[in-house]
Design a protein with these regions (language model features):
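Domain-level signal for soluble alpha/beta catalytic cores
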Residues: 1-289
Length: 289
């Protein structure tokens, strides 16, 4: 994105953190290195290699650390694979607290198909110190997803939200939710005992001022609850708390046709085995080759 710019990435980050620290100083607030997606899809959906994404995020994080950032905030991610690259890069290049946030569509998934639960489990497992949901939708639409996010995590694990001010108006005159309506629609979030709440696209200082009043007497921390073992892919989530059906046919032992498919690179045959097991009710696939 900086192609053709006269400034280096490190210069822009240093200037941004310096400006943020000056603005935060009177309030004792923290300055975050706020990082979004790289703007290029990772393989196999795009052309960016996972290792290259890790390297690029590592460069960004190192620049933020050198500039004096107090924490790292990854937000508006829609690809769990890319968020994984970002979190690995942060853990490898700094000891700062890390917040991770994804943006979900109205159906409860990101545009790459990631579920709320898969995000929660993966981000926590990769070392994020807090997780949340931001952008795309307003408070009312995000609330059911925020509730699922909180339920997928231990009670003492920090959760936050940053909804939009609704949707942008077609005439370009702003967003369809006023500060007063935003504050009213944020009241149900009090029951989630959030670590933090804020606003994303379309929100202004007027929104945040009223939001502060909504949460002024709230304390973070949800009741403790038992956390079952879970398995997940970006698009599915399985709780292992009883009988879990595992498909084990993706295994060449004693299967001549499968062995032939492996030798010939016949991935269609192997994929058929996976699909047939899924359609038969398998919740998990054991790939043993």
């Amino acid at each position: 994105k900086l192609a053709g710019s006269e400034y280096a990435l490190e210069e822009i980050i240093a200037a941004g953190i310096a400006n943020c620290k000056r603005a935060c100083a009177p309030y004792g607030a923290l300055a975050a290195l706020d990082v979004g997606p790289l703007g290029e899809l990772l393989e196999p959906n795009g052309t960016l290699a996972f290792e290259d994404a890790v390297a690029e995020y590592g460069r960004i994080v190192r620049a933020g650390v050198a500039a004096g950032a107090d924490l790292v905030f990854f937000e508006t991610f829609t690809d769990l694979y890319e968020l994984k690259a970002a979190l690995l890069a942060a853990k490898e290049n700094c000891d700062l607290p890390i917040l991770a946030s994804m943006s979900f569509e109205a159906g409860g998934r990101t545009f790459t198909g990631c579920t709320v639960e898969s995000f929660a489990v993966t981000a926590r497992g990769l070392g994020a110190n807090a997780v949340g949901i931001n952008c795309s939708l307003g408070p009312k639409e995000i609330f059911p997803m925020a509730k699922r996010l909180a339920e997928a995590l231990p009670g003492d694990f920090p959760v936050f939200v940053k909804p939009n001010a609704g949707l942008p108006r077609a005439d370009g005159s702003g967003y369809d939710i006023t500060p007063q309506l935003f504050a009213m629609e944020m009241k149900p979030y009090r029951d989630l005992k959030l670590f933090a709440a804020g606003g994303c696209c379309g929100t202004t200082p007027d929104f945040i001022k009223l939001l502060n009043g909504v949460f002024a007497d709230c304390k973070p921390g949800r009741p403790a609850h038992a956390m079952p073992s879970v398995l997940c892919s970006p698009m599915d989530f399985v709780t292992v708390d009883g009988i879990t059906v595992v498909g084990e046919r993706i295994n060449p032992t004693g299967k001549k046709r499968f062995q032939q498919a492996l030798r010939e690179g016949d991935m269609n045959y192997i994929l058929e085995q996976a699909v047939s097991q899924s359609e038969a009710g398998a919740q998990v696939l054991d790939v043993n080759v």
